[in-house]
């Protein structure tokens, strides 16, 4: 809650004539911040970077008070946050560091011995590499779905029809699978 209060106070100081209602913005922050950070941790592999990118997404939202009447603020936030996260990965010369951090997080949450840890780490590195080769929209689809978003939430975030998400997701999964197998043909199971 400290982060929400600090961010909220800071944003109120920088507000212009037209600004967000502080209570409304605080509610949006509380509803979406934790989930957006979780999605970004999966993407970036580092909680500190995920917090930074999430805060940037909320700053961008706050600077656009017209979005109060948008009706799909959550979708706008998810799309903006994943776009920003993808940009961070692309611009960073430390992609490998992010991949290793993401694998460490996965390893911390999964029991197993050193060999299991090593295999999981390598698998995470491969998955992140293949995700970086996909079209941004395909990578976003897969990341949002793996984070547990529903088809409707994904549709809202990517501004597509909810009825299209299943087909788009199938195509993204197939593209991911094809690229993964092409790069790692001897791996038994995806």
Residue ranges and their predicted role:
Residues 1-9, 13-19, 24, 96-99, ...:
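C-terminal edge and immediately downstream basic/flexible tail or linker adjoining helix-turn-helix-like DNA-binding
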Residues 14-38, 48:
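A short, charge-rich alpha-helical start-of-domain segment used by transcription regulators
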Residues 23, 27, 103-132:
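Acidic, proline/glycine-rich intrinsically disordered inter-domain spacer in sigma factors
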Residues 33, 37, 58, 135, ...:
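C-terminal flanking helix
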Residues 52-59, 63, 71-83:
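Structural recognition of an alpha-helix C-terminal capping motif at a helix-to-coil junction
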Residues 79-100, 120, 182:
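Arg/Lys-rich amphipathic alpha helix in sigma70-family domain 2
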Residues 82, 86, 158-183:
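DNA-recognition helix of helix-turn-helix
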Residues 132, 136-139, 147-167, 178:
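Helix-turn-helix DNA-binding module
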């Amino acid at each position: 809650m400290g982060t929400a209060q600090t961010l909220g106070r800071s944003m109120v100081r920088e507000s212009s004539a037209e600004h967000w209602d502080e209570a409304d913005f605080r509610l949006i922050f509380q509803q979406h911040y934790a989930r957006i950070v979780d999605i970004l941790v999966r993407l970036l592999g580092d909680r500190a970077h995920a917090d930074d990118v999430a805060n940037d997404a909320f700053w961008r939202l706050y600077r656009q008070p017209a979005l109060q009447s948008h009706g799909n603020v959550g979708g706008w936030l998810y799309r903006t946050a994943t776009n920003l996260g993808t940009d961070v990965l692309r611009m960073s010369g430390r992609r490998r560091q992010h991949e290793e951090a993401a694998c460490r997080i996965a390893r911390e949450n999964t029991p197993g011995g050193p060999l299991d840890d090593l295999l999981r780490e390598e698998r995470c590195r491969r998955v992140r590499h293949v995700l970086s080769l996909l079209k941004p929209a395909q990578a976003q689809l897969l990341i949002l779905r793996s984070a547990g978003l529903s088809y409707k939430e994904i549709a809202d975030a990517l501004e597509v029809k909810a009825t299209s998400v299943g087909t788009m997701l199938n195509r993204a999964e197939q593209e991911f699978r094809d690229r993964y197998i092409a790069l790692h043909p001897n791996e038994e199971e995806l």
